Amino acid sequence: MNQQLVPAIKVKDLSFYYNTSKAIEGISMDIYRNKVTAIIGPSGCGKSTFIKTLNRISELEGPVKVEGVVDFFGQNIYDPRININRLRRQIGMVFQRPNPFPMSIYENVAYGVRISAKLPQADLDEIVESALKGAALWQEVKDKLNKSALGLSGGQQQRLCIARALAIKPKVLLMDEPCSALDPIATMKVEELIHSLRSELTIAIVTHNMQQATRVSDFTAFFSTDESRIGQMVEFGVTTQIFSNPLDSRTRDYVSGRFG
């Protein structure tokens, strides 16, 4: 392996169940530090479930069972001694639809910081500005920080949610189809943002958009489901190889549009 490729997250034989219903089975892959990894595959193949297992947010959806290991910089996140709140600060999440809180733009970004630390106002102001700049939103909102976040456009709201995640300085950012509800211009801005953030963050993104996966990611994992196995990872590799010369015929059929 290239010495520059350092895994931020190592997934080993991961299976996940909602109650007794299996959602993903036997997933093993690395998510490399300061790289973008795309998770692709047809609907119902476990992409979103998988990404939610990486910071244990899936547990908020009801009784679950986990088998296998998710190693985050040397620690199994499913170790019972893990501090889940600290884990979720280190591995942030951006969801499919923008979910700004019904409060001001400023307070949306400051929210997570206020929960985790009591800071002087000047320090908080600096963090909010830095996060909004990191999300490429500062110039658009700097004169209306006290206005409701609900008045922003859909694309601005999604970048605000990214800023909210950035404010608590995560090491990894998980993105679950972050552009599916956005128009092409807003999508382009989010993709540009992903490119700019990769130098600071490790990013994993679920997407149905094959073109988006080729544009933004360094590595791609293809998930699928068949009659014998549900929620399996068929193939993982460098994005250019996955899309131009996949090793598995199922991957080839999917990326060429023959199914899915």
Swiss-Prot record:
Broad class of enzyme this protein falls into: translocase
Compartment list: Cell inner membrane
Entry's Gene Ontology molecular function annotations: ATP binding; ATP hydrolysis activity; ATPase-coupled phosphate ion transmembrane transporter activity
Key word Cell membrane present: yes
Catalytic activity: phosphate(out) + ATP + H2O = ADP + 2 phosphate(in) + H(+)
Binding site for ATP: G41, P42, S43, G44, C45, G46, K47, S48
The family this protein is said to belong to: Belongs to the ABC transporter superfamily. Phosphate importer (TC 3.A.1.7) family.
Listed name of the protein: Phosphate import ATP-binding protein PstB 2
Native source organism of the sequence: Nostoc sp. (strain PCC 7120 / SAG 25.82 / UTEX 2576)
Taxonomic placement: Bacteria, Bacillati, Cyanobacteriota, Cyanophyceae, Nostocales
Gene that this polypeptide is encoded by: pstB2
